[in-house]
């Protein structure tokens, strides 16, 4: 056993000796490489001495201190050799070395564990460590000092200060702090040099991670040389050459062409672990000889890398929505290609075409409005300015496709607008827009073309984008024409349209908004008069499509259900549409134009009104403008329909208008106006001005919003096409609770709505008086909105949207006609009901009559049946433009009416209103977007119903009239279910939100 143990010890000892030998060999090899490199480097500088000096054996020649003092003199420019004393005695040598070391310490060169005795004895590791510190301080640190201020910080791990030099710095109690500072300075300088190399080489596909293995192939050296002079190196050929060939070629080219001394040999690099200090010493020469190369880097990004991508985050929108701006340098000019990208299932179809689109040549017909100009740079710069500055209307020139710029200019115009999803241009409508013009089956175009348009847009997003922009331009111009008159009409449009347009117009039509302002300023373009209908650019397209469709009788099919927006639009449009009523015939093309102008202006005004509304809750001016302008078109009718002063309510009140006006007074006088005017113009406008149908269904109700008539209005059958972003996106700036509460009506609102339920009967007596007005205004109301042609245009409008949803609010007294024809007939047949609804707004004061409420409920039930029939008919035909989204206020109204609003995501390019039973939301859960929407809607609806049930118990009574309300009330009565739904919603929201967080920016 002893023999075996002895053998084991011998074997272990032998292994240890072999390991020591290997380490020693590596150390010797490294010392040899460093010695050779440092010797060459020292000789480069000693050549400058007079007389020149030369180092043959570094470890021997440095022992007397003369070489060291001469080197420091050259590097620092100070005179040190005069202190040198030549002598063979050790004491004098130590004195010379000590003077040199003292000079280094005075120069803030940290020397740890290096003393004169070790240098005088020629200790290899300490001598090399001393020389390395001199190189690092006098060359690398000085050269990288400027780079560190300009170059981006590199996240790459810096190379170590050097094995030998580090080993020569054993920390001592007295020098511990100095060691830390020295190591920190070393790493900082090395890191700066590495960052410089990376910037030079990355453009050629060479990844330099350190100053060791990354240089072994020789490609890094070649890349640095190519960065200095691209003509010297062929990187493709280098990839085929061997490592030795690349290294030899690199060192040779650097010496011959760049006059960089050859400090290294291929053998020095072709090892497993090349010496970092030697490589850094050599590479630093490139930076020393070509310091101007760093300044050129500023331009290299443009020259070498033609495309820079910049992400412009739109805070108002979900993090999913980001605009990618590609900056292309073309002939010194910058053009911008803007793609609005979203992660929502339906890809957004908004494309800002590379082709600059100028609106110089506008054909209101929109058939051929493609006036492309080369002002793309200016236009795109303006777009970027809007994105950066957030100025919605900074590009107000008609010649510029502001709608597109508005894509990026989706801004925080309102807190609400921020919360609303940013609408993208109804890209599919571009095709449909042309289709209606090309084919007169606008109903077909409107119904079928949107999908085709969507596909075609997907296929030809660029062309469509151009078309869309041009159509928008046309619409803007047309909107400008009516805006002179519609500026005031838009006042009313502001509120409702503002609510929906808060999201849409603010987001998509920042430019339109600007153009709207500009348009308002350009009141003289043409009298909005008869043919001028102000329409949002998005809806303009829809209107264009719906123009003939309405004429064909598919009015509701062509009606985009931007109910919230369009209630105001319809009221304003009702007044404007009266002009159409006066001249219905020219509207096939002009109605489109008018619809475009009206919707554009309405959307613009809506945006501004939204802005002002969120800013202030009182601003009668825009409404006054509407009153002025609407009377300009239909002053008489609106004088009757809009007698209430609330329209004069300052725009500052518009926020309340969005929330409360829609809740409370959406009907009051603006319904009167909208209904009277709309009823009058319905028959006429239906054929003549499909834009009216395109005008949001809420237009009738928008006057009260704008009028801010806070009298409790009769129960509104409010349709809300809810963008799913409203739910699961608190928009980061708005607390989730605030977003949820935004859809819950206050107790006062609930009471008002309850009183509204009571109102209908109270309105009934007034209806008698109002019937006359309604009779006079049936044509206008019907023209403004077929569904709204019924007495309470807002009810019908909401109901239409609800009809689209498939729920008839129990509170709605008047049946909604799916078709304008049918509605016109109904408006005439239901004149008492029309006047009843129209009088609901005037008779807000009569809210408190419970008997009236009972009578109203009965009438409502019968009317609901009729409306349901109409709705069923409408549902098949109704098409919702992607932009058609109601504001949260509309949502509140919808929930108050116990109707389940159809969920439309703003990103959906084609959305059809669906009749939703409580089961529809369940089916929607199968898609993650619909799941979130359904959860949100159910939660909010349940909460609202619960509050209503608690406050008045009417929810149950109303629920008895509608099976949906029954199920909802039953669901509401189960708090556990409500909390469970809320929990699920929050869970889904978190799961969907987390993947979209930009963790890289944290």
From Swiss-Prot:
The chain crosses the membrane at residues 977-997. Its main location: membrane. The keyword Repeat applies. Residues 585-606, 618-635, 650-659, 818-834, 854-863 have a biased composition (Basic and acidic residues). InterPro entries: Actinin_actin-bd_CS (IPR001589), CH_dom (IPR001715), CH_dom_sf (IPR036872), CLMN_CH_first (IPR047827), CLMN_CH_second (IPR047826), LINC-complex_assoc (IPR052403). The lineage of its organism: Eukaryota, Metazoa, Chordata, Craniata, Vertebrata. The gene is CLMN. The keyword Cell division does not apply. The modification Phosphoserine is found at residues 301, 402, 619, 713, 769, 838, 841, 907. It is found in: Membrane. Residues 1-288 are annotated as: Actin-binding. Residues 607-617 have a biased composition (Basic residues). The modification Phosphothreonine is found at residue 699. This is Calmin.
